[in-house]
A protein has these predicted regions:
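Alpha-helix-loop-beta-strand connector modules within alpha/beta enzyme cores
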Residues: 38-45, 67-91, 131-145, 194-212, ...
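Glycine-rich phosphate-binding active-site loops on the catalytic face of alpha/beta enzymes
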Residues: 118-120, 168-179, 234-250
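Histidine/lysine/aspartate-rich catalytic loop segments that bind and position anionic ligands
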Residues: 160-191, 202
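Active-site beta->alpha loop and helix N-cap motifs at the rims of alpha/beta catalytic domains
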Residues: 37-127
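Hydrophobic faces of well-ordered beta-strands that scaffold small-molecule active sites
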Residues: 11-18, 58-61, 81-87, 114-116, ...
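Glycine-enriched alpha-helix->loop->beta-strand junction motifs that scaffold or abut catalytic
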Residues: 78-80, 108-112, 141-143, 162-170, ...
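Active-site glycine- and acidic-residue-rich loops that bind
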Residues: 91-95, 144-157, 190-194, 220-222
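Structured C-terminal cap/extension of enzyme domains
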Residues: 4-13, 31-32, 39-49, 55, ...
Length: 266
């Protein structure tokens, strides 16, 4: 499997994402609860161990006290997977500025990379909060980590491409919900439209930094092999992919996905 340098960090071509660990199913509320019931701390650590054994060396995961604690346990027990921190905001009043605290906590906790949450990026872009983009880019650079931005809107990634000096862009194949008013995830009215994917592919082709391809399977709402075919046709040599994996569905899922990535993409 390929290894790509992103801001000086050596990252495996396929990485494991953390949405299933935190119950973000992008399907039904019942499915989300099934994920959190299954992914106890022990099962999260097992998934990370299996990822390492399969050749995955990087975890893209949420910034919260739960994930911080699991990662600390995992590293203390000898785990070596590295962490790109998904920097978020809070739902509470005034919580829209919490990204600064979560970014610093992530750096202090040992992340090697960080990126602003895709919903936050969509919201900043729609609200024209350009100062937040520039400030966050400077803080990530000052923290001596690989820094980037996720996002579901192709327009946001085009703006980032043209206006920020960063290490990577993290491009979603789909834009399931409108985040222009509220940055937080909602499982109401999600859509998985081909037109969004094709527009993002066009922007990806013009981005100069490495791109992290994510939501490649529409969070399990589209055929898996179709997603690998899209990766094959649209990932460049210096790009990687991030995939969440719910191993309750298939205990061999991590190993199988690595094999499929190697067969289709590498």
């Amino acid at each position: 499997m390929r290894v790509v340098s992103i801001g000086g960090v050596q990252v495996s071509g396929l990485c494991i994402g953390g949405n299933p660990f935190s119950g973000f199913a992008y399907q039904t509320k019942e499915r989300g609860k099934e994920m959190t019931d299954f992914y106890t701390d022990a099962m999260i650590k097992q998934a990370l161990r299996e990822s390492e054994e399969a050749g995955i060396n990087t975890f893209f995961g949420r910034t919260d006290d739960h994930i911080f604690g699991v990662l600390r346990q995992y590293w203390d027990e000898g785990g070596t997977i590295q962490w790109f921190a998904q920097v978020r905001i809070e739902r509470d009043e005034g919580g829209e500025d919490a990204w600064r605290d979560w970014l610093q906590k992530s750096i202090d906790h040992g992340c090697v990379g960080a990126y602003i949450h895709g919903g936050v990026v969509d919201n900043w872009y729609a609200s024209e909060k350009w100062d937040n983009f520039h400030e966050s880019a400077e803080l990530m650079k000052a923290g001596n980590i690989s820094g980037g931005y996720a996002g579901h809107m192709f327009g946001a990634h085009a703006w980032i491409r043209d206006n920020l000096d960063i290490d990577f862009q993290m491009c979603s194949y789909y834009n399931p919900t409108d985040r222009s008013i509220v940055a937080h995830h909602s499982d109401e009215g999600e859509k998985w439209e081909d037109v969004d994917r094709e527009a993002m592919f066009e922007v990806i082709s013009s981005i100069q930094t490495p791109v992290v391809h994510y939501k490649v399977f529409a969070a399990g709402n589209r055929p898996i092999r179709e997603g690998f075919e899209f990766m094959r046709d649209n990932m460049r040599e210096g790009d990687i992919a991030c995939v969440g994996m719910f191993t309750k569905d298939d205990p061999e899922m991590i190993r199988k996905n690595v094999s499929l990535f190697e067969a289709y993409v590498d």
